[in-house]
Structures are given as structure tokens and as C-alpha cells.
From Swiss-Prot:
GO MF term set: actin filament binding
Coiled-coil residue windows: none
Entry keyword set: Acetylation, Actin capping, Actin-binding, Phosphoprotein
Gene coding for it: CAPZA2
General function of this protein: F-actin-capping proteins bind in a Ca(2+)-independent manner to the fast growing ends of actin filaments (barbed end) thereby blocking the exchange of subunits at these ends. Unlike other capping proteins (such as gelsolin and severin), these proteins do not sever actin filaments.
A Pfam family matched in the record: F-actin_cap_A
Protein known as: F-actin-capping protein subunit alpha-2
Organism name: Notamacropus eugenii (Tammar wallaby)
InterPro entries named in the record: CapZ_alpha, CapZ_alpha/beta, CapZ_alpha/beta_2, CapZ_alpha_1, F-actin_cap_asu_CS
GO biological process terms held by the UniProt record: actin cytoskeleton organization; barbed-end actin filament capping
């Protein structure tokens, strides 16, 4: 092990550490960071060399953050990234600095979004917040209005998590939905992601995602937002139901097939007669 450590350059050590951090399960960033910190044994190297991994983790995980002075949380996503460690809260029209290691928001300042698309963004946000409140009690959503390649685009991100470290499991739901505002009809593109880690007496992870594409009729802002939410609700319900049914099927068939029905002897043990068995006598003599 010492020989291997001597062969690794600082760059290689940081690259390995960064991979561990980026793949940390939901709610376990601090634990993975502390373990990597002990292994690397060089805080300056870790902070400087793996800073991109801290940022990538928060962007990938849709990390929610509370801005002081504002009631609702906002998600850290690539769509709100303003550069230089600053992010956008489109609902409250503020920018803020985000510390990717401490996961803290500071220095909120007024920041105007794209006014030309604000009425569309606001309508979708209102409908989306009502949907999230109904289906994800602990959920957070952030809705952006942006011009991408000359097209006015709405992007809605949802995050909901449950961290149960005392019960040895953590899980997170993420979904991202987008559509461009075009006459008559447009395409809604979505990606749904589930990640769960269970680690009591073992180490099991569920990592699943599904891509969605549906047609959306475009009319006025409010009606289009309602139709958009119908698509989101149907797709997310179907996906979650399918995940549950697959797990039930695996429990009834796959996992059951892995269990040995009988001992190697092909006979069941009569525990009332255990002393008459050779193993029973050996236990008695012991």
C-alpha cells in the first residue's frame, strides 16, 4: 500500500478523491468528504484540487439552500449558475453567493431575470409549486425562464429528499422538465432520477433514471402551465409506480430465487431433535 501511495502523484490522488466525492450518496457528502480528507491527509490539496467536485456534486444533486431573509428554498442547478460562485433565485429575483463545501448562501442582491419571458415563468412556477406541495411534502422546486439558442425556454427542477441516517438509509428524488414557447405545440422533455442508499448490515444502492418526451399544446400562459403540470404528474406517477412494482416483483421472484430453500443436506432440521444430530452432540460436548 505504501509503495502504491508513493507511485501516485498529487494530481492522481486528487482525481481519485474527486470521484469519491462526486459519487457520494444523497445526504452523505460530509461523511465521504471526511473519509477522503483522512485518506488524502492534505487539506490544502483537497480544497484546491477537488473544489470542482464539490460544485459538481451540488449541481448534480439539485442541492436546496435557504437564503437569509427569504422564506422558501432555492435549488442549486446549472440553470441558475451565474458564474464566479453566484447563483440565481428566479422567484425572488436575487443573486447570491454559494459556498459549495459549507452549502451556505450569502450576499443576496437584486438580479432581474429575462422580463420577456417572466409571465410564462411565473405561471408555470405557480402551478408547479402547487403540484410539488401536493405530491412532495418536503419538496423544493425552482423554475427558470431563459433564452436558449434564440428560443424562449421554461425549465422546471424538482428535488425532494429524506435523510434517515439513524435508520441507515438516505434517498433523493430529482426531476427536470423543459419546453420552448412556440406557437400551437411544443415538445416537453423531462428526466426523472431516483437515488437511494441503504447501509444497515450491508450496502445497497438504487440508482435509476427515465427520460420523458411528450407533446404540449401551447395557448395562453395559465392554460399551458396547467397542461404542462398534467404531463409532469402523469409521468412521475407512472415512473414511481413502476419502480414500486419492480421491487415487489424482485422480492417475490428474483430475491426469493437467491435464497436456498433447504440446507445442503436437502432436509430440514427438526430443532426438537437437535441433540440427536451429530452437530447437536458436538455442541453439547463443547
Amino acid at each position: 500500500m505504501a509503495d502504491l501511495e508513493e507511485q501516485l502523484s498529487d494530481e492522481e490522488k486528487v482525481r481519485i478523491a474527486a470521484k469519491f466525492i462526486i459519487h457520494a450518496p444523497p445526504g452523505e457528502f460530509n461523511e465521504v468528504f471526511n473519509d477522503v480528507r483522512l485518506l488524502l491527509n492534505n487539506d490544502n490539496l483537497l480544497r484546491e484540487g477537488a473544489a470542482h467536485a464539490f460544485a459538481q456534486y451540488n449541481l448534480d444533486q439539485f442541492t436546496p439552500v435557504k437564503i437569509e431573509g427569504y422564506e422558501e428554498q432555492v435549488l442549486i442547478t446549472e440553470h441558475g449558475d451565474l458564474g464566479n460562485g453566484k447563483f440565481l433565485d428566479p422567484k425572488n429575483r436575487v443573486s447570491f453567493k454559494f459556498d459549495h463545501l459549507r452549502k451556505e448562501a450569502t450576499d443576496p442582491r437584486p438580479c432581474e431575470g429575462e422580463n420577456a419571458i417572466e409571465s410564462w415563468r411565473h405561471s408555470v412556477e405557480t402551478a408547479m409549486r402547487a403540484y410539488v406541495k401536493e405530491h412532495y411534502p418536503n419538496g423544493v422546486c425552482t423554475v427558470y425562464g431563459k433564452t436558449i439558442d434564440g428560443q424562449q425556454t421554461i425549465i422546471a427542477c424538482i428535488e425532494s429528499h429524506q435523510f434517515q441516517a439513524k435508520n441507515f438509509w438516505n434517498g433523493r428524488w430529482r426531476s427536470e422538465w423543459k419546453f420552448t414557447i412556440t406557437p400551437s405545440t411544443t415538445q416537453v422533455v423531462g428526466i426523472l432520477k431516483i437515488q437511494v442508499h441503504y447501509y444497515e448490515d450491508g450496502n445497497v444502492q438504487l440508482v435509476s433514471h427515465k427520460d420523458i418526451q411528450e407533446s404540449l399544446t401551447v395557448s395562453n400562459e395559465v392554460q399551458t402551465a396547467k397542461e404542462f403540470i398534467k404531463i409532469v404528474e402523469a409521468a412521475e406517477n407512472e415512473y414511481q409506480t413502476a419502480i414500486s412494482e419492480n421491487y415487489q416483483t424482485m422480492s417475490d421472484t428474483t430475491f426469493k430465487a437467491l435464497r436456498r430453500q433447504l440446507p445442503v443436506t436437502r432436509t430440514k432440521i427438526d430443532w426438537n431433535k437437535i441433540l440427536s444430530y451429530k452437530i447437536g452432540k458436538e455442541m453439547q460436548n463443547a
